[in-house]
Amino acid sequence: MAVFTQINDTQLAEFMADYALANVTAFKGIAAGVQNSNFIVETGDEKYILTIYEDTATGVNPDDLPYFLGLMQHLAAHGINCPTPIMQKNGNILGQLAERPAALVSFLPGRGTVTPKPQQCRAVGAALAELHLAGADFEMRRVNRQGPDNWRKLYEKSQDSADEASPGLADFIGQELQRLETAWPQGLPEGVIHADLFPDNVFFDKGEVSGLIDFYFACHDMLAYDLAIMLNAWCFEADVNFNITKARALLAGYQSVRPMSAEEIEALPILAAGAAMRFLTTRLYDWLNQPEDALVVPKNPVDYLRRLRFHRHVTSAADYGLES
């Protein structure tokens, strides 16, 4: 979350007049994040998150907003702790503020973690499985635009300069892309996936998962791929060493709610390598193409190069701690 567009009291009051809520008593910007402008809005005893969707290179496509907001509405109605879009008096959940699309959603208690503990990994694994089950009857569809086709496109745009990030990187990515494209699984169970459930997108309160946020990469894809993304995001330490204790807990939590098929388990190593490739290629492209006036420093792509090298040597899901 971040603040790119500043708003004043008058603008906010006009926007909030479209909602059947108490008068605003306070609001403040939220400084973290990379895509949109976010504010905490207080109305008496209640708190909400106001998001202004920015027209930037990394911003959300306005055409996708009905999907994202509709998905949050659906998941919240099915018991998932995620932001619930607040409906305006006219029944809409998307409005306009500062000449940009904007939405108001419920405020969730808790906070994210930088160094997740094994018990948190288990809890979030179960929460991901619950999300997958809750999304099974969501009727809207959105293609995963961060899939293998996009990795190839980003690689081709970055290939000539890739070795600036790490010597030999261009050749390594080229070879690994070919391997992944050849072996990429087909026919696995699909449905709604979050596709970006990093530790900063999960809130914990008193040891329990209190909120899943930032659904702006959500789409329809293989469910096990979502879990593979989390293996990368939750189970490597700051020095990029793999923590099998955390991975074992994450997988056990997921399996306790939605047991994976034998085919999903067999595909987990290639899916985890693909997830690492996704973030390697996106971060490499961003690192090589940082605008001079960028408000956010691009993340180092080498962290995901190291993850990808680890996954190349994984022979089965047992290497991730999956217990049969």
Regions found by a protein language model. Give the residues of each.
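An alpha-helical support segment within catalytic cores of ATP-dependent transferases
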Residues: 7-19, 139-141, 153-195, 205
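Conserved N-terminal boundary motif of the eukaryotic protein kinase catalytic domain
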Residues: 21-28
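Active-site acidic catalytic loop and adjacent metal/ATP-binding pocket
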Residues: 31-42, 49-50, 85, 178-225
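ATP-binding pocket architecture of kinase catalytic cores
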Residues: 43-139
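A cross-family kinase active-site recognition segment
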Residues: 114-167, 188-190, 295-301
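ATP/Mg2+ or Mg2+-diphosphate-binding catalytic cores
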Residues: 159, 279-324
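Active-site activation/catalytic loop segments of kinase-like enzymes and analogous catalytic loops
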Residues: 224-259, 273-291
